[in-house]
């Protein structure tokens, strides 16, 4: 016997999600529970995969098996497909393993043609219902299978209602609906160039194909990418005998949740509509009634429904989202699934289910999607306002939250406008470190270029600001302070609203609501901390960021980028003097001005972290990022150095590099200018000694991290400068304070020679942004230009800068840990790239034995929860 592709509901169960999809598995499970489910069958996800393997056709064997199961349905129902005495009508629905918005809409009443309509009209003595079913079927099939837009049919309905002087669809009579059905068929022929199919088998195969096709539509692909759903899963198709909610006033249809999906409060929440079918409830054609009103209309069916809700919630031990139909007072269940919910509701439901004895703490931790916690920590758009808003463009949702403000085009303007009380959105082609003060002053940041790990994205996430990056549809005119998007021109001072979670951009003002964290958040986080192994640190460069991260549960700083400190107004001038100096003495003199300021920065960080570990990365970016670009600043620098403007411009020109990300940066700066490493070491050690003196009970052990090491000899050279300087400072202070010198692993060669590097490094920290960039040979700032094409061609399913590439980059990490720990068993390893806040990447870090992950402050709760889930899934508690 060949492979089985089709299963009756009675042949499946709730554990078969991979094969039957979520909807099919749940229909089978409800059947097994003895609930009133219209019977049918599920075509498996493997049939979908086969459809694509066969070149997007349903092969004859699978078609034959489907028709064999139609015959089985005929036996169960006593009706026949396409029959002119007792015809069988079916619905066709998609159903992937995970709930997938954007997949194909439902098709109802399949199996109808004009002859069958006449039969059911006579048989039921209800011609209005019969023609209503047919016109709905033509509309759904045309829209969903043949992609003839709904609007053409809606226009015909509106015209008919106008002619008849009525306002609701239900007020149209049988003759009106018959006329509409004929108009719909004519519209179909005009658009498609062929007659509407009358053969039920042709209709069925067309609908099944449409479900398979929808697995690969652009909406589904984007949703899959955002939610880690592999393309290889495929979707199942459910074919179910019809239950009719549109046969009269003793019929109806509804959607309900066993708890409120917005708040998590226990109690039935949903809507119901009499004499209606399928999508009518959610389509908003008529105003539905609250589910509680169903009790007056259909007391028997309502009582049964309340019992079913109770059975299903207890069975699945989770909040259920259900669809049902009432036909002549009799209840039929069409679907159940774990309901989608807000982050706030997810926390409340998880806690309540533990209190009700339905779930253990570990199970409750596993119920919550870590990524959804983002929405708890940032402002969001008002739910009603956003529902009626239409985006004018879309970029990448690079840093969550919602923001609304007046457009400005420079960091200086952002600061100036904020100073006078304006709320602004900073719009840039791309951002650079010198834009930081302007980014801080803005409600949100919008960039034309750059990906999920671009400068704008990383900095915005660190600050907890909203950011949409890489909106390449924007046509920028910086000189005239304007841009165009979505066919409209926007000037400085115009209002726009941006959503950093979805990447959507809106014209005008959309009101926002502040984030609220309820008591359940703390409770779930306490459970997460109880079960996780991985430590969670933060990437923070300022005391404000550090304090925020600590508040959100960070256990130390895994990355302090010292370069951001150089951009402050009181020190950039001195640093520029250092860059333009001719001798070591001149450079040391300029650095001496920065030393007390940098020391002060570090003292504040140590104070904020109260004895938790602090890892400080020495200067990383190339020097050209620090030099002035404005004429006035160049003149100022020339005057301070006693040089001509031309000489300064020549120095600036000499710093230009063809490939700066692989150029004169990281440890290479410390090799060329050891005095920079010396000054930074003094600042770190003096700050630590002062903090220790003020708080002798704190554990202050500085961790100094050398970036971009590719060769053991580089590390030896820089480490000697650090150790000689640090030891002298500690000795002079009469202290015995300990410190560590470690390295970033961000060049593939460092991972490959990790055994050598571990002989000098006391800790490894994986800088996965650069490691990904160098392993793939992609520039992270330019990859957005071609990644879309890679997604379409199915080369990539995810952005490797947002989700760690476990097979390539991950292999290098595993290798480095193994080699390093062989040489130095006490070696502690962490990750401080943006991947540290991505749940699937955190799970991988747990699996390969990292000691900690470090991420931006607002991602700390996400990492804590993801780390707990990784440990629980691994069965370590």
Regions found by a protein language model. Give the residues of each.
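Short beta->alpha connector loops at strand-helix junctions that form conserved
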Residues: 41, 448-450, 469-472, 560, ...
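Protease-associated
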Residues: 358-442, 504-510, 521, 525-529, ...
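Conserved alpha/beta-domain cores
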Residues: 93, 517, 527-877
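C-terminal domain-closing interface element
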Residues: 334-336, 491-539, 545
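Structural motif
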Residues: 238, 408, 425-427, 446, ...
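Nucleotide/phosphate-binding sheet-loop regions of phosphoryl- and nucleotidyl-transfer enzymes
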Residues: 1-389, 422-425, 432-437, 443, ...
